[in-house]
UniProtKB/Swiss-Prot annotation:
Cystine crosslinks: none
Designated name of the protein: Alpha,alpha-trehalose-phosphate synthase [UDP-forming] 2
Recorded catalytic activity of this chain's protein: D-glucose 6-phosphate + UDP-alpha-D-glucose = alpha,alpha-trehalose 6-phosphate + UDP + H(+)
Organism: Aphelenchoides avenae
EC number(s) per entry: 2.4.1.15
GO biological process: trehalose biosynthetic process
Composition-biased stretches (Low complexity): 212-221
CDD domains: GT20_TPS
Enzyme class: transferase
Pfam families found in the cross-reference section: Glyco_transf_20, T6PP_C, T6PP_N
GO molecular function, one term: alpha,alpha-trehalose-phosphate synthase (UDP-forming) activity
Record's keyword terms, sorted: Glycosyltransferase, Transferase
Entry GO CC: cytosol
Length: 1303
């Protein structure tokens, strides 16, 4: 039996040879398929057949479950009567009937996927019936879907993905995520994640190879990022640093140059040594712009000879985007080239493949596409393979057509074959892509495209968004038509979205254009939430009042869809204001904020944030000026004036010129009515003025357009007849032209005109007004408020209410009298005054050209993702800013660890945060004076913060991001070298300490356990704990060290876990480290695994709570309030309390320290007079109040390590252990490890204290251990850890080949 995808046989199970019936025939997704040709020949109704099959299956299942139901009921009646809900209820019971109900649900799903084009309402009911159990259902049901696709060639997976997408679009829910949660691999497969990752790693490997063979320079891998001679202060690392950076590889790796190897850098590796595996990031792809539009930037034509011709387009969108796209040949443009898959012809082709009397040659493969032989633009198959709505077999046909294999000649020589291949469509497209940005066609089904473009986009969305409801096609009054066309719109948007995501890399910016593709952002974000997607609406956004009621089906998804873009650009403030207004009305849960300084609205809805900006589009000035300034154009303009106005025109004669598409939005009919009224009101202008109207005919196939155009043409003829006069026999009041003008002719008309007329009813921007004034600065301008350019000019002060007005405004194009008056004012305006006004307009347009427009939109600085510069006045401002930088740093760390290049807005955010802090500092210092809160009066003592460390950490992070994005695979060493300036002694001392530390880490090679303190060890002390955000570079280094050099890693700190604890200030992703807070008394392993020391009695915790409350009350007193923000402030840990009485910079006077110390001791004495439960311990920076352990001692980090070991069943008696600390509180941690494993401990101490060094040395020697290193600052420890990460590959290799020298 021939297998045909998607069609099932529903006959009852027939007895097998042994007399038993085969259950396979009754199982959904596993039934045999009937032959398509026999069904077509018999004329049977496929939909009815499949529906009857599904009906019988559900009836059989319901009867098996004991449900009474009318066996004559139709499939729709069964569904409407709650058939799916009943099946779902039985399935959820998880009893003996569940499997039967499950098979019934599969039958419904199978039917829905077979007819995904026309059973969307059934699928919605199906998903709703599953309720909160969709994940469980998909987990059990998707294997059946996959099995059918693999065994029978169906496309159920694609149908399921689209059906869920349509469901989410229409309902505003996120059910597609549930499918991804149930079957994680389906999303990766759909997006080609593994293929992308392979490409990135291959690219990285090529980079490494190219670096190793670079140009014969001794600099080799230590080349600076920037040439010092060219970039001056921009340098990050200079050439003179090469030798110093080279030292970081120490004695383990050296670089030598083979003079006979054409400049290749050879690595000489000593016995037992390691060679570097690369830097901290493993991809080097740079950001691209992926432009997505309905229309392509080119036109394709097939000549009669069979050769293809491709021409760059000249439309408005191409002019707008070309400057930014042409910068990088890796940029990509996705568009529909006008040839799509014809579903009916696909079926014919399908039958050809299955018929013995037909072969592929019997049906030309071009017939599958909506193209003709003489103009058949075809799309490469690479963008359609695996995409929904398209059979995979068709990919071979598409490629066959594109390569034009069917026209190759017999016995042609190689030269002829090369010429033929170059002139084939595939060759033409490849040639275009070699010399331009990449053009990638998007192929969809022809029937869908016709409905999407010629139907709902132009018949509903275009007039609706222009607020011209009278031009909405009447067919959309029918809910069924609206639904069908809306589904086609979603399907085409889905196809564009899939193509865009599959062709994108994580660092790319995807730019979607115009009203055809308003849902792509929502669909793309459901596939990959990390994408950065912008959308620009080139037309107005002014839907009529009934849009959200009469056309609710598409209105609400469009609103939600636009809010799923990262940022949305509008042409005018009018359009954005309307959108924000409608969001407030129809999406009341959305939160809208406005940044007046940046003029940006941010809308947060359903967990997504979207920035809304205004970007008036413009023109490429130089393209028009080049033509306008040529002698040929100037002469042509003079000839035009003479031809129209005569050789000797009247002095006051005026040529009015207007050019636009013949579209009802352009107000051509209203213009003609006003022009007739002009002569009626001002008969003295008869015989003088001429209106030259160019209305380029388009969309004649649409009834509303054809009727409108015919009416206007008739009106033009009537005007010429009505005002013809014998006094001026050669004068014609109106020239009406319906064909277009080439650019040179257009510019000549601009030069010839006296007054430009641009008066649309509603328009996005209308660039004609700008073209006119750029070419002819002395011309007058009649401009309607319907044009976006008029709004832009008004906001620029070019038409003030009181003052000099630079153009003649038409407020209401339907008011013929006022419209006529505007004509008259423009006609009689003195030439000098008119020229002055035109010059002002010209200057404004010249200063706001198209490059500024595209650059402004792409600028990451206006997105809500960016931290903007802000004024820091009080503590809340300061801490809020630092927490925002924590979020940014976490994203940086995560992206680097995943090998995803860093977006530019991260650097902008950190730079803006740094500048905000610098501007808030006292003049000439790095000290902040902040109010505790804005409510405090002026007499309240401000908080003082020395933020030198915070500013340094910002600088290091900014430096880190420059290195991490470099193409040099040795960016680790380069970054380490940049840290030397932060060493408290000298750069030489920094290098010596890093080398010594690196040698110890290399000797240990790999650690079974890594226990470390945080503050003072891995990070310098901050001005206060909430500000001690872990820098991004530190997070990356620590995570990579945990990944490559250690097995079990734990950060043990005296800080609390949460509520401004160690988890709040960390930027390392979960899974790399365990966190032991309160000296290891409470542990965070992962969100599902947290534990505490259970030995503390409840009454002791209550006692500690009383102490904490008393100290909190003390800090409310004005005399002591400033201790709230000194250092770590007041912190409640599990088992102890910390109150800072001095900061790291000794800025608190000694008498204040003594005063608060005494107050705290008084509180302790009052609550625990005998100190039976509490013990006070003072340090230089704080007072710690501990609950005594069962032994009566203070719980320390050594006990914290033992608690972890006991709970996690760790064996620290074997293997190697790395311990890092900086103070006496870390000594118990070291001692606990030495007691368990004396010879396996390696320890690093960040200290310059000789006393502490002696204590550590004596402790290690007591256990016979000599594996200790002392460093002066956290930067050295991090540098050594970073150096250790490049030892991922540890291989003992022989030296150079013996024959090397002879060679």
């Amino acid at each position: 039996m021939t297998v045909v995808p998607g069609e099932t046989q529903c006959e009852e199970a027939q007895p097998a040879a042994n007399g038993s019936s085969s259950p396979v025939l009754l199982q959904p997704f596993r039934r045999p398929r009937t032959d398509s040709r026999s069904r077509l020949d018999s004329g049977s109704n496929n939909t009815t057949l499949s529906e009857d099959c599904a009906r019988k299956s559900i009836l059989r299942t319901l009867k098996s479950l004991g449900v009474e139901i009318d066996e004559s009921a139709s499939f729709e009646a069964i569904i409407d009567s709650g058939g799916i809900e009943k099946l779902a209820d039985f399935w959820r019971k998880r009893d003996s009937s569940s499997e039967i109900a499950f098979q019934g649900l599969l039958s419904v799903l199978e039917y829905c996927l077979q007819h995904s084009f026309d059973t969307n309402e059934f699928f919605e009911k199906f998903v709703n019936a599953l309720g909160y159990h969709t994940v469980q259902f998909w987990r059990a049901g998707v294997p059946y879907v996959f099995d059918s696709d693999m065994s029978h060639g169906t496309k159920y997976r694609d149908a399921l993905l689209f059906s869920l997408t349509l469901y989410d679009v229409n309902t505003g829910k996120s059910r597609l995520k549930e499918l991804y949660a149930a079957v994680p691999g389906i999303r990766k497969s759909l997006l080609g994640v593994h293929a992308k990752r392979f490409g990135e790693q291959y690219h990285h490997l090529q980079r490494r190879r190219s670096v190793s063979s670079r140009g014969g320079s001794l600099r080799g891998s230590m080349d600076s990022l920037n040439d010092s001679g060219q970039n001056g202060a921009e340098d990050v690392i200079g050439v003179e640093d090469e030798e110093e950076a080279q030292k970081f590889r120490g004695k383990r790796t050296s670089i030598s140059l083979d003079p006979a190897a054409a400049g290749e850098v050879m690595f000489t590796i000593e016995d037992g040594a390691c060679f570097p595996s690369g830097g901290l990031a493993n991809t080097h792809f740079q950001q691209r712009v992926i432009n997505v539009s309905n229309a392509p930037p080119v036109s394709l034509k097939r000549e009669k000879s069979g050769e293809w011709e491709i021409k760059q387009g000249s439309g408005g969108l191409v002019s707008c985007v070309d400057p930014i796209m042409s910068v990088n040949q890796e940029n990509m443009w996705l568009a529909n080239l006008g040839m799509n898959i014809d579903k009916k012809k696909m079926l014919r082709y399908d039958d050809c493949l299955r018929s013995q009397e037909h072969t592929l040659e019997n049906m030309r493969s071009t017939e599958l596409l909506n193209v003709t032989d003489d103009s058949a633009p075809l799309a490469p198959a690479t963008n359609t393979l695996g995409l929904p709505l398209m059979r995979q077999a068709l990919a071979d046909v598409l490629f066959h057509v594109i390569a034009d294999d069917d026209i190759k000649e017999q016995n042609e020589d190689e030269q002829s074959r090369n010429v033929r291949e170059e002139m084939s469509l595939l060759g033409v497209l490849n040639q275009y892509n070699r010399s331009n940005y990449k053009l990638n066609p998007v192929v969809v089904q022809e029937q869908d495209y016709n409905v999407y473009y010629g139907g709902i986009s132009n018949g509903l969305l275009w007039p609706a968004l222009h607020n011209l409801p009278e031009y909405i096609v009447a067919d959309y009054d029918d809910p069924k038509v609206l639904y069908e066309h809306w589904c086609a719109y979603v399907r085409v948007n889905y196809q564009f979205a899939i193509d865009a995501v599959r062709n994108s890399r994580p660092q790319d910016f995807i730019w979607i254009h115009d009203y055809h593709l308003m849902l792509t952002g929502m669909i793309m974000q459901s596939l990959d939430s990390s994408l950065e997607i912008g959308f620009f609406l080139h037309i107005p956004f002014l839907p009529p009042d009934n849009f959200f009621t009469k056309y609710r089906l598409c209105a609400f998804p469009i609103m939600r869809g636009l809010l799923r873009f990262t940022k949305v650009g509008f042409q005018t403030h009018r359009d954005r204001a309307k959108f924000v207004e409608l969001v407030g009305i129809h999406l009341p849960t959305a939160r809208v904020t406005y940044d007046e300084k940046m003029d940006i609205h941010t809308v947060t809805y359903q967990g997504w944030s979207c920035s809304l900006g205004v970007f008036p589009v413009s023109i490429k000035n130089e393209d028009f000026l080049k033509v306008a300034q040529s002698a040929e154009t100037i002469k042509k303009a003079d000839d035009i004036r003479k031809e129209i106005l005569g050789e000797t025109p009247v002095d006051s004669a005026r040529l009015l010129f207007s050019v636009e598409r013949f579209d009802y939005t352009k107000g051509i009919k209203e213009k003609l009515l006003a022009y007739r009224r002009y002569f009626e009101r001002h008969p003295d202008r008869i015989g003088k003025d001429v209106l030259y109207q160019v209305a380029v005919t388009n969309r004649r196939s649409v009834d509303t357009y054809r009727m409108y155009q015919d009416e206007c043409i008739q009106m033009a003829e009537d005007i010429n007849k009505e005002f013809a006069t014998d006094e001026y026999p050669n004068w014609k009041p109106l020239i009406f032209r319906t064909d277009g003008l080439q650019r040179a002719d257009l510019v000549a008309h601009y030069l010839a005109m006296d007054v430009g007329v641009v008066t649309p009813k509603k328009d996005g921007m209308n660039l004609v007004a700008k073209e006119m004034l750029v070419c002819n600065p002395s011309a007058g301008l009649v401009l309607s408020t319907g044009a976006g350019s008029e709004i832009q000019f008004t906001m620029a002060g070019l038409h003030p209410d009181d003052g000099d007005k630079c153009y003649h405004r038409v407020v209401d194009v339907y008011d013929a009298d006022h419209y006529a008056d505007a004509f008259y004012e423009a006609a009689v305006e003195p030439e000098a005054e008119r020229a002055a006004h035109g010059q002002r307009l010209n200057e404004f347009i010249m200063n706001n050209d198209i490059e500024r427009w595209s650059t402004a939109f792409l600028d990451p600085g206006w997105s809500h993702l960016v931290i903007r510069q802000s004024e820091i006045k009080d503590l809340d401002d300061f801490y809020s800013l630092m927490m925002r930088t924590r979020d940014v740093r976490r994203q940086i760390v995560e992206r680097v660890l995943k090998g995803i290049p860093i977006r530019s807005h991260f650097s902008i955010s950190l730079s803006n945060a740094k500048e905000s802090l610098l501007l808030a500092c006292q003049p000439g210092t790095r000290t902040l004076h902040l109010k505790p809160s804005l409510e405090e009066d002026e007499q309240t003592e401000p908080a003082h913060f020395d933020i030198a460390n915070e500013l340094d950490e910002f600088e290091k992070d900014l430096n880190f991001m420059k290195f991490i994005q470099s193409d040099d695979v040795y960016n680790v060493e380069q970054f380490i070298n940049s840290l030397q300036e932060y060493h408290p002694v000298s750069a030489d001392k920094f290098r010596d300490e890093v080398i010594e530390l690196g040698d110890m880490l290399t000797e240990a090679d790999h650690f079974n356990f890594f226990f470390t303190d945080r503050d003072g060890t891995l990070k310098s002390y901050s001005c206060s704990y909430p500000a001690s955000i872990q820098p991004a570079y530190s997070g990356v280094i620590q995570a990579q060290f945990a990944r490559r050099c250690a097995q079990t890693c734990a950060i043990v700190t005296t800080a609390p876990l949460m509520r401004i604890g160690v988890l709040d200030v960390s930027t390392i992703p979960e899974g790399y480290y365990y966190f032991g807070a309160s000296a290891g008394r409470e542990w965070f392993i992962d969100p599902a695994n947290k534990f505490k020391d259970q030995s503390i009695p409840e009454e002791d915790l209550e006692l500690l709570e009383r102490v904490f409350a008393a100290i909190s009350d003390l800090l409310e007193e004005p005399k002591f309030k400033h201790f709230t923000w000194v250092g770590s402030g007041l912190q409640k840990h599990y088992g102890h309390i910390t109150i800072a009485h001095q900061d790291a910079f000794n800025s608190v006077p000694r008498h204040q320290v003594r005063a608060i110390d005494q107050k705290i001791k008084d509180i302790i004495h009052r609550i625990d007079p005998d100190q039976h439960t509490l013990k006070v311990k003072e340090t230089e920076t704080d007072i710690k109040i501990f609950l005594k352990s069962e032994s009566g001692e203070i719980f320390d980090k050594g006990q914290g390590i033992r608690l972890l070991v006991e709970h996690m069943k760790c064996d620290i008696s074997n293997g190697t252990i790395l311990v890092c600390g900086d103070s006496s509180t870390d000594l118990p941690m070291l001692q606990a490890c030495l007691e368990a494993n004396p010879s396996g401990v390696y320890t690093v101490w960040v200290t310059r204290s000789d006393e502490l060094k002696t204590t550590v040395r004596e402790l290690c020697e007591r256990f016979g251990n000599k594996n200790f290193v002392f460093v002066s600052c956290p930067e050295v420890l991090l540098g050594g850890m970073a150096q250790a990460t490049i030892r991922e590959i540890s291989i003992g290799r022989p030296g150079p080949r013996a024959s090397h020298d002879s060679e």
